[in-house]
């Protein structure tokens, strides 16, 4: 299995053949999620929890507190139901763009797991991940893309 990650500027791609399960942690805004992909690149189950503001938009600190409160339970549930911790060969996490306090929670969980398991830690650009999943699913080799996401809206061509 090849795990790809891009720098925040989307310029440099790194690939790493990990040969086993990769846990992925998403924490860019209102959702904290942990999922996995197997050695053939087939995604498994993911478990998520969302912040639902009563009024207005997402408050970054409240969302981060939510993520911190739920991270352990989500990880425990995934490991109990889906994943043998001994088969995990890498930890991937959303490194941005996103809400700073939320990103820090995800990065901390990811770093802790990678350190405990002595496996590689791979930061993934949130924008690039959306684009690459879409590109892979449609089978496009050289698309021109419109990525419309608030302050991160871009027209992208290789």
Question: How should these model regions be labeled?
Answer:
Residues 1-158:
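Short acidic/glycine-rich loops and adjacent helix/strand connectors
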């Amino acid at each position: 299995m090849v795990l790809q990650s891009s720098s925040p500027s989307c310029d440099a791609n790194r690939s790493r053949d990990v040969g086993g399960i990769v846990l992925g942690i998403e924490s860019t805004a209102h959702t904290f999620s942990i999922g996995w992909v197997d050695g053939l690149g087939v995604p498994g189950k993911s478990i998520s929890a969302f912040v639902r503001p009563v009024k207005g938009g997402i408050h970054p600190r409240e969302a981060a507190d939510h993520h911190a409160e739920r991270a352990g339970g989500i990880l425990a549930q995934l490991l109990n139901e889906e994943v043998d911790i001994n088969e995990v060969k890498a930890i991937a996490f959303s490194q941005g763009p996103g809400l700073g306090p939320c990103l820090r929670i995800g990065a901390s969980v990811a770093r802790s797991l990678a350190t405990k398991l002595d496996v590689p830690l791979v930061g993934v650009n949130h924008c690039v991940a959306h684009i690459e999943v879409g590109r892979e699913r449609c089978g496009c080799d050289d698309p021109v893309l419109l990525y419309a996401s608030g302050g991160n809206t871009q027209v992208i061509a290789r």
